Amino acid sequence: MSFVVAAPEVVVAAASDLAGIGSAIGAANAAAAVPTMGVLAAGADEVSAAVADLFGAHAQAYQALSAQAALFHEQFVHAMTAGAGAYAGAEAADAAALDVLNGPFQALFGRPLIGDGANGAPGQPGGPGGLLYGNGGNGGNGGIGQPGGAGGDAGLIGNGGNGGIGGPGATGLAGGAGGVGGLLFGDGGNGGAGGLGTGPVGATGGIGGPGGAAVGLFGHGGAGGAGGLGKAGFAGGAGGTGGTGGLLYGNGGNGGNVPSGAADGGAGGDARLIGNGGDGGSVGAAPTGIGNGGNGGNGGWLYGDGGSGGSTLQGFSDGGTGGNAGMFGDGGNGGFSFFDGNGGDGGTGGTLIGNGGDGGNSVQTDGFLRGHGGDGGNAVGLIGNGGAGGAGSAGTGVFAPGGGSGGNGGNGALLVGNGGAGGSGGPTQIPSVAVPVTGAGGTGGNGGTAGLIGNGGNGGAAGVSGDGTPGTGGNGGYAQLIGDGGDGGPGDSGGPGGSGGTGGTLAGQNGSPGG
């Protein structure tokens, strides 16, 4: 590590550049001296002579000023060069003194008092940072058949080292865990990515390493490592979990993603007192298997939003659930599901003030009774609105698929808050030669209930039907004391609309039924 602010080699290089600039300017001044100082008169008259003398006087004044500037420039370059030498000497002296100080601590505890830990050899852990100050070393990347090395831990102040990447193998090797941050200040290190699966059978990717925790008062948790890639036709490895944030302040780390699907994304790390939860890891697509999005981490106990749930492109897999907020904050949104899976539910809002997170959408389904939108999160405190329900999936397959139902809206807070709107039901496709019979449009989600003061959420609209049973709209949420009931969602093609929610008992109107 550098023991002074200045970098001597940079200062020396700058001084050399300045010297070169000075030489170029000096050469240009010398070349201009003769023609400018010896200007001939245009004629023999007195006016021409006076003009020539004026130009010559200006040239002489310029040359005198240039000489002074060149002297200052030379002195400045000498000062920079001398300063660089002084910095280098001071750094060498400090390093020597620090080596003497670190020696006993290294011998007794296996780590210096001040200084960064060494990076690990292939597959080996990084060295710990100094007891007083210093970052942990990075774990070494794994070779063939080797897991990634864990990142080194920090001491009192410093960041944990990053975990190494897992090595390739018949089954990919795990990535190394991120090191923990300093006991006072410092972030956790990121987990290493999982290794590549290369074997002929069961060649799945390695799991990502977990992110390091910020165990001190201040710091962010490290991100989980990405899952490794599987061989063609095989699943990837699961994503690593995110690390927790610092005791007083810090966000949880994000969960690791899964690029090739068929394994779950990593869960986001939790915050502790103040901070946001980490987002859950997202999942790519693979030919077979299940791969759900990671759940979002919870927000800080005092203040912080929940992390968003991870999304998934993998078939028959669900989006991750959003994390819950603490005392103040909003719940995280649920992740979406792309094919034959349900959207993730939204997280709950703060226990005092905060909104529920929105439910995740479901994009399409092949008719396997899945593909529902996630429910909106409830506002569980005194003030806050419920989250909106996610939209149901569109029916696109050949098994008489119906659209997925929309998610229900979350309830409003106990005192003041509106109910969340229900998600719309998914549509079905138009009958064709390939798909002669289609299912019903998805049912709209119900609107959420309001708090003592607030409006009920509107019901979701039914999905458009092909030749199946017309879809039904969702019911509107009801108000409690003061507020209007939510409107019912409209049905499709003559299908029943949802009922309107009742208005408040003290003041408010009933919601309109869906058409």
From Swiss-Prot:
Species this protein is from: Mycobacterium tuberculosis (strain CDC 1551 / Oshkosh)
Compartments reported by the entry: Cell membrane
Residues annotated as transmembrane: 1-21, 165-185, 199-219
Membrane topology according to the record: Multi-pass membrane protein
Keyword field contains Transmembrane helix: yes
Assigned GO CC terms: plasma membrane
UniProt feature, compositional bias: Gly residues: 349-360
Domain PE residue range list: 1-93
Protein name per UniProt: Uncharacterized PE-PGRS family protein PE_PGRS34
Alphabetical list of Pfam families matching this protein: PE (PF00934), PGRS (PF21526)
Keywords: Cell membrane, Membrane, Transmembrane, Transmembrane helix
Cited InterPro entries: PE-PGRS_N, PGRS_rpt
UniProt similarity note: Belongs to the mycobacterial PE family. PGRS subfamily.
Gene3D superfamilies: HP0062-like domain
Positions of the UniProt region annotated as Disordered: 349-368, 463-515
